[in-house]
Curated annotation (Swiss-Prot):
Enzyme class: ligase
Name of the protein: D-alanine--D-alanyl carrier protein ligase
Taxonomy of the source species: Bacteria, Bacillati, Bacillota, Bacilli, Lactobacillales
Similarity comment: family membership: Belongs to the ATP-dependent AMP-binding enzyme family. DltA subfamily.
Originating species: Streptococcus pyogenes serotype M49 (strain NZ131)
Pathway in which this enzyme or protein is active: Cell wall biogenesis; lipoteichoic acid biosynthesis
Residues annotated to bind D-alanine: D199, V303, K499
Gene Ontology process terms (BP): lipoteichoic acid biosynthetic process
Function, in words: Catalyzes the first step in the D-alanylation of lipoteichoic acid (LTA), the activation of D-alanine and its transfer onto the D-alanyl carrier protein (Dcp) DltC. In an ATP-dependent two-step reaction, forms a high energy D-alanyl-AMP intermediate, followed by transfer of the D-alanyl residue as a thiol ester to the phosphopantheinyl prosthetic group of the Dcp. D-alanylation of LTA plays an important role in modulating the properties of the cell wall in Gram-positive bacteria, influencing the net charge of the cell wall.
Gene: dltA
Annotated compartments: Cytoplasm
InterPro entries: AA_adenyl_dom, AMP-bd_C, AMP-bd_C_sf, AMP-binding_CS, AMP-dep_synth/lig_dom, ANL_N_sf, DltA, DltA-like
Length: 512
């Protein structure tokens, strides 16, 4: 068990100073370098005399200097707000307006001119590193101090800044490095794919730094070139893969993504969106010896609150895979619309309690009051997810409360429709979306479909293909759930975080 994230990193700087902490296509940085660089940057930040414990926005990609700056800010007592280089200017402005950071550190060129907030460039960070200033940690982030603040998309379009404290982070990290499901080895070799602005990134960097491992990052130019990206990934000596299931689906478009070509890859950690039976089955075919761990949890409960190793038996017997056993320190409950706790097997809203629950949204008391509360004497959070608990305390996922629609008199869960379509042996990926009329009522259901290789060639017309897909799922799909129109695509759009961009598809079919 670790008691201080920075102390853990500092220990490895003493015991394995020359061991790589970061590797970007062979360009390496060691634990000793991370200690020296973060000390120097922390001393530089202290010299700026910022307001104590004020948040600092850090703009960039998955580079070593981002990592060193994060560690430096933690040492100097400031929470960091990671903002990805691909963020839209409007979003960056909204984050700045809400967070009111005391400083902006631009590891990449900053796209905006902001009055009233000092900006530190990469050249200044490089100069600070060259100064090699010693640093004594007297006011580092600890306890309930904010460690990082990650902005998620709000339902109104306004981002919400989730405050994660040092204690929140320790609750998650200690569970992950000790839980048998994750089976994290010492000195883990982790793929660092999700951007730092997505809290799934914490699932790779926190256990890696806590156990003295190496992060294998990818340059941002490579991420845009999918063919080259997966050719490169196949050559990396990574042992643990952390991503959304959608990113793994994309990886499986490459024939090189298999156990024969990547024998070191033994663990897959999934979170951020639902892991489908179809994706898990394909992964077992590609990596017969691998462990597949399905984790679940909102950003507001520090990355994940439950996890389970997916077995072949689960893939054969479940239509929706279980999302795990809740963390021991985070009692998880199912409640009805009146807030009453439901019994095992009953479906309702998933709420999480315990020390991993955030203190709320930064500078947003109204939204905080809506989502955060106290349950059985512990801090609690409304996930907005539908689920149930089995008698064995396994959490089952039932979709999103806000992705439920009323259609033809039936209440339909969009993710359930997508799941059913994904059961077809002809479908590689499917998403159901509603089309609304002028009265904002659901007019009909549509489905975006990506078929498996070679399927289209078997049919002369799309109409015949649609009939065949419908026939392949009709035995386990209610007729009222069947989309009236299928739209075929070569791929589905992804958000910067690697999730299928359902909102873009909904806007597309509704001409928004």
């Amino acid at each position: 068990m670790i008691k201080d994230m920075i102390a853990s990193i500092e220990q490895f700087a003493q015991t394995q100073a020359d061991f790589p902490v970061y590797d970007c296509l062979g360009e390496r940085r060691t634990y000793g370098q991370l200690k020296r660089d973060s000390d120097s940057i922390a001393a530089f930040i202290d010299s700026l005399a910022l307001l104590a414990k004020s948040p600092v926005l850090v703009f960039g990609a998955q580079t070593y200097d981002m990592l060193a700056t994060f560690v430096a800010l933690t040492k100097s007592g400031h929470a960091y707000i990671p903002v990805d280089v691909h963020s839209a200017p409007e979003r960056i402005l909204a984050i700045i307006e809400i967070a009111k950071p005391s400083l902006i550190i631009a590891i990449e060129e900053f796209p905006l001119t902001i009055e009233g907030i000092s900006l530190v460039s990469l050249s200044e960070i490089e100069s600070a590193k060259l100064a090699e200033m010693p640093y004594e940690r007297t006011h580092s982030v600890k306890g309930d101090d904010n460690y990082y603040i990650i902005f998620t998309s709000g339902t109104t379009g306004q981002p919400k800044g989730v405050q994660i404290s040092h204690d929140n982070l320790l609750s998650f990290t200690n569970w992950m490095i000790e839980d048998a499901a994750f089976d994290v080895p010492k000195q883990p070799q982790m793929l660092a794919q999700p951007p730092y602005s997505f809290d799934l990134s914490v699932m790779y960097w926190a256990p890696t730094l806590a156990l003295g491992g190496t992060l294998f990052a990818l340059p941002k130019e490579l991420v845009a070139d999918f063919k080259q990206l997966f050719t490169t990934i196949a050559q990396l000596p990574v042992g643990i893969w952390t991503s959304t299931p959608s990113f793994a689906d994309m990886a499986m478009l490459s024939d090189d993504f298999c156990q024969a070509k990547m024998p070191a890859l033994t663990h897959f950690y999934f979170d951020g969106e639902e892991l489908t039976v179809s994706t898990a089955r394909k992964l077992f075919e590609r990596f017969p010896s691998a462990k597949i761990i399905n984790a679940y949890g909102p950003t507001e409960a520090t990355v994940a609150l439950s996890a389970i190793e997916i077995t072949r038996e689960m893939v054969d017997n479940y239509t929706r895979l279980p999302i795990g056993y809740p963390k021991p320190d985070s009692p998880t409950y199912i409640i009805d619309e009146d807030g009453k706790e439901l019994a095992s097997g009953e479906q309702g809203e998933i709420i999480v309690t315990g020390p991993a629950v955030s203190k709320g949204y930064l500078n947003n008391p109204e939204k905080t009051a809506e989502a955060f509360f106290t349950f059985k004497g512990q801090p609690a959070y409304h996930t907005g997810d539908i689920g149930s608990l089995t008698e064995d305390n396994i959490l089952l996922y039932g979709g999103r409360l806000d992705f439920q629609i009323k259609y033809a008199g039936y209440r339909i869960e969009l993710e359930d429709v997508s799941q059913q379509l994904n059961q077809s042996p002809m479908v590689a990926s499917a998403v159901a979306v509603p089309r609304y009329n002028k009265e904002h009522k659901v007019q009909n259901l549509l489905a975006y479909i990506v078929v498996k290789d070679g399927v289209k060639e078997r049919f002369d017309r799309e109409l015949e293909l649609t009939k065949a897909i419908k026939a392949s799922v009709k035995d386990h799909m209610m007729s009222y759930m069947m989309p009236s129109k299928f739209l075929y695509r070569d791929s589905l759009p992804l958000t910067p975080n690697g999730k299928i961009d359902i909102k873009t598809l909904i806007n597309e079919v509704n001409n928004r």
